[in-house]
Each structure stands twice: as structure tokens, then as C-alpha cells.
UniProtKB/Swiss-Prot annotation:
Record's keyword terms, sorted: Glycosidase, Hydrolase, Lyase, Manganese, Metal-binding
CC cofactor note: Binds 1 Mn(2+) ion per subunit.
Full protein name: Pseudouridine-5'-phosphate glycosidase
Cofactor(s) named in the record: Mn(2+)
UniProt enzyme class: lyase
GO BP term, pick one: nucleobase catabolic process
Job of this protein: Catalyzes the reversible cleavage of pseudouridine 5'-phosphate (PsiMP) to ribose 5-phosphate and uracil. Functions biologically in the cleavage direction, as part of a pseudouridine degradation pathway.
Cleavable signal peptide: none
Family assignment from sequence similarity: Belongs to the pseudouridine-5'-phosphate glycosidase family.
Length: 320
């Protein structure tokens, strides 16, 4: 095991036995959702993973150790004000200080890969921000997807982003974007961005075969499995886009950027939509967790079926 890695006994036992495990990020606790919805949702996500046959492994940094699998007390600790938001660049700094931090998509992928977890469920990936031509703001999640072999089950990229440019970036870096039950890339709060995906999977087994084919071929890097928000929870596309545009304009006027930008935008969206964005966010998180668990189950089964038997020892030649 890696020096900085601490795997919860339940997760370690599942991995050793080849049982399905789903990685979960922790920034939704510290930055993504307000209290008390943050802890309630994190626990509900873990329950959704279990209900669909897999073991949840929420990931964070605590006391300078990457923790793979948390208990309720750990989650409560992450909800404390001032918890750091940890992406790839931040991991060495937080680990070296022995500090705490909640992991983004990128950092969660790194930890999942170190632990041997193939499937990670989250709300939405980061991507190319609107106005990138002046800000240069591109999420580290995209480069992580290009290099780290973990499948990310999500409702597309966060609605605050430039979706066409995000998909172009993923195409350039060779990251397959697969629609789960859809031919269109989801737009987070609503089901159809009007942009096509690279391929479609209609069952967990279909998705598992894509994962298996890519990695058995030796192609490093992740896969985006894009799952539309449940229809009953989706927001009206025009209203959601109007709220996003207003929030982005307010951020630009206020000079909000860097790590503070996404939490600011999500908070403003909650206000501008009268709380509807928070309800939608929770619904898609739970749905993605359930789908991710079913894909993890199918992938674990497929790995067992396709694992080659160990080569028998060479037979001894008779001696005369």
C-alpha cells in the first residue's frame, strides 16, 4: 500500500475479494452543498451505492493521509468551516502539512486509482469555464481524465461550464464520453445539452464492456459515463441557463475566480432558482451513485469472467 494511503477495512476487504467498490468525492460535503443537506446527501449517496450491490468509498484527506472510505465522524469533520478543497496540485501540500482536505474529481480519481477502484460516481465533472479566452480557467479534472484510469459516472459537466469546449478538450485528450441511455451529452440540471456523445450504453453491462475494452487494450486514462438527471427532477433548460448566465456575470463583476468560483456559482444558482438547483443536484447525485454501483457490479463480474487462469508451472522432465 502507498505510504500516504489509508483504506477502510470494509473497502480493503471488498477490493481483496474482487467485489465491486464505488469511489465518491468529498467536496460536496465541504463546498458543494449547504448544511445540513451536505451530510444528509453524502450518507444517502453511500446508501444508494449499497442498495445497488457495491461498497461505497468516500475519499478525503485527513491528518495528512488519503482516506479511502469514511465513517460518519470523518464526514462531520469535513463539514467544518475552512476545510481545504484538494485537487491534484494541492495533494502534496496538504499531505506534507498533515492537514485535512476534501477531494475534487481529480484528486478523488488519483486516490481511487491508487487504491485499485475502477468506478467513481459524482455529480458533474469540472471542465472549460465560460470566458476561458480571457481567464484561461480549465479544470484539472480534464487532464486527470486523460491520464488516470478511472471511469467517472456523472450528469455531464457542471452547468456553469462551457460544454462545447469541454467536450472538445476531452476529444483532444482521447477521453471517451459515453451516454448512459442517451445519445446526447447531459447538461447537469437538464437532460439534453444538444451536443452528441461518442457512444451510447443502455445497460451497466454495456458500460462495463467499454471500460474493459479500453483498459485491456492498454489505453490509459478515464472514461466519462454521462447519465441524464431523472426526468422528474430536471429543471427547465431556459430557466437554468438564464440563472447560470446571471451567476457567471456576477462572478465576473465581483472578481471571483480560482477555487472560489465553483462554490460561488453553485450558491448563487441555489438562490436564483429558489432552491430548485439544490433539489436537482441531490437527485442527480443519488441517481449517479445508483448507476455507478450497477456498473461497478457488472465490471467486477466481467473482470472475473475474463481473467485468464494462472499459467501452470512447467512440467518436470523425467530423468533417466
Amino acid at each position: 500500500m502507498h505510504d500516504f494511503l489509508s483504506i477502510h477495512p470494509e473497502v480493503a476487504a471488498a477490493l481483496k475479494a474482487g467485489r465491486p467498490v464505488v469511489a465518491l468525492e468529498s467536496t460536496l460535503i465541504s463546498h458543494g452543498l449547504p448544511a445540513p443537506a451536505n451530510l444528509e446527501t453524502a450518507q444517502a449517496i453511500e446508501a444508494a451505492v449499497r442498495a445497488n450491490g457495491a461498497v461505497p468509498a468516500t475519499i478525503a484527506v485527513l491528518d495528512g493521509r488519503i482516506r479511502v472510505g469514511l465513517d460518519a465522524e470523518d464526514m462531520q469533520r469535513l463539514a467544518a468551516p475552512g476545510t481545504a478543497k484538494v485537487s491534484r496540485r494541492d495533494l502534496p501540500l496538504v499531505l506534507a502539512k498533515g492537514a485535512d482536505g476534501a477531494t475534487t474529481v481529480a484528486a478523488t480519481m488519483i486516490a481511487a486509482d491508487l487504491a485499485g477502484i475502477a468506478v467513481f460516481a459524482t455529480g458533474g465533472i469540472g471542465g472549460v469555464h465560460r470566458g476561458v479566452e480571457t481567464t484561461g480557467d480549465i479544470s484539472a479534472d480534464l487532464e486527470e481524465l486523460a491520464t488516470t484510469s478511472v471511469a467517472v459516472v456523472c450528469a455531464g459537466a457542471k452547468a456553469i461550464l462551457d460544454l462545447p469546449r469541454t467536450l472538445e478538450y476531452l476529444e483532444t485528450r482521447g477521453v471517451p464520453v459515453v451516454g448512459f441511455g442517451t445519445d446526447a451529452f447531459p447538461a447537469f440540471y437538464h437532460r439534453d445539452s444538444g451536443l452528441p456523445v461518442d457512444g451510447r450504453c443502455d445497460t451497466p453491462e454495456d458500460a462495463a464492456r467499454v471500460l474493459n475494452a479500453k483498459w485491456r487494450l492498454g489505453l490509459a486514462g478515464g472514461i466519462v459515463v454521462a447519465v441524464p438527471i431523472p426526468d422528474e427532477a430536471a429543471l427547465d433548460a431556459a430557466q437554468a441557463e438564464a440563472a447560470v448566465q446571471q451567476a457567471v456575470a456576477e462572478a465576473a463583476t465581483g472578481g471571483v475566480r480560482g477555487k472560489a468560483l465553483t462554490p460561488f456559482l453553485l450558491h448563487r444558482l441555489e438562490t436564483l432558482t429558489g432552491g430548485a438547483s439544490l433539489t436537482a443536484n441531490r437527485a442527480l447525485l443519488l441517481n449517479n451513485a445508483a448507476v455507478g454501483a450497477r456498473i461497478a457490479v457488472a465490471y467486477a463480474r466481467l473482470k472475473q469472467e475474463t481473467t485468464l487462469p494462472k499459467k501452470p508451472p512447467p512440467s518436470k522432465r523425467p530423468t533417466y
